Design a protein with these regions (language model features):
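Cytosolic regulatory regions of ion transport systems
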Residues: 1-221
Length: 221
């Protein structure tokens, strides 16, 4: 189970509401803030600490306990002035990690300049994931974990079946690290190097962000 932390969400549009619900479902503490009472009322059904306030008011944020949050999320990417103010206020209050939603790359870079530790551009990110999936039907899920590496869940490649990690030597040849295998509804962690891949396995691995370009090579091993 994930460590319990406190997240403050500034902006309760569809993205903010969904995020608040998911974090609450994962037993995390959420402070949900928006100046629109209608949106606050929507999340108050599942978030105990849902507040109607203008988050450009740093004193009001401090009084709401925002300074004790572990992570802040600013979701108002289409309203740049509000997003900038939200990021700056969270940082000034000492929130250690601030994530901001942006509607384009230019806005994302600006939010990073004013203090956001990470930005997300949902439409752009979705398009990238879609393109990767179209290039290789073997990729089930792919999430960037940093600027260089991704976490992937893939269908076991046909040429891997009947072979083990020692034989495939994925780490040395392709810098691919297998961290788990899902088989028959069970998840195998700390995979033994002698464990042979079986048909219908789903493999969890960490690799470079451009690994999808090399799937044809991986399937020829």
């Amino acid at each position: 189970m994930a460590e319990r932390k406190t997240y403050v969400i500034l902006g309760l549009g569809r993205f903010g509401q969904t995020l608040a619900k998911q974090l609450t479902d994962f037993n995390q503490d959420v402070i949900a803030i928006d100046k629109d009472m209608a949106d606050v009322e929507k999340v108050s059904a599942f978030v105990a600490n849902a507040l109607c306030m203008d988050y450009s008011d740093i004193d009001a944020l401090a009084a709401a306990g925002v300074k004790d949050a572990d992570t802040g999320i600013v979701t108002t990417g289409t309203m740049l002035d509000q997003a900038i103010q939200g990021v700056m206020n969270l940082k000034e209050l000492g929130v250690p990690y601030v994530l901001a939603k942006a509607n384009n790359i230019k806005t994302a870079r600006l939010l990073e300049k004013v203090g956001a530790d990470k930005t997300i551009t949902p439409e752009n990110d979705m398009a990238v994931r879609c393109a990767r999936a179209l290039i290789s039907n073997d990729i089930l899920e792919m999430v960037d974990v940093d600027a260089e590496n991704s976490l992937l869940k893939i269908k076991v490649l046909s040429n891997w079946v009947g072979h083990n990690l020692k034989q495939l030597d994925l780490r040395t040849k392709y810098s691919v690290n297998v961290i788990g295998i899902e088989r028959d509804g069970k998840f195998i962690v700390n995979v033994n190097p002698d464990e042979e891949f079986k048909e219908n396995d789903e493999v969890l691995l960490v690799a470079s962000n451009d690994i999808y370009k090399h799937f044809s090579e991986l399937n020829k091993i």
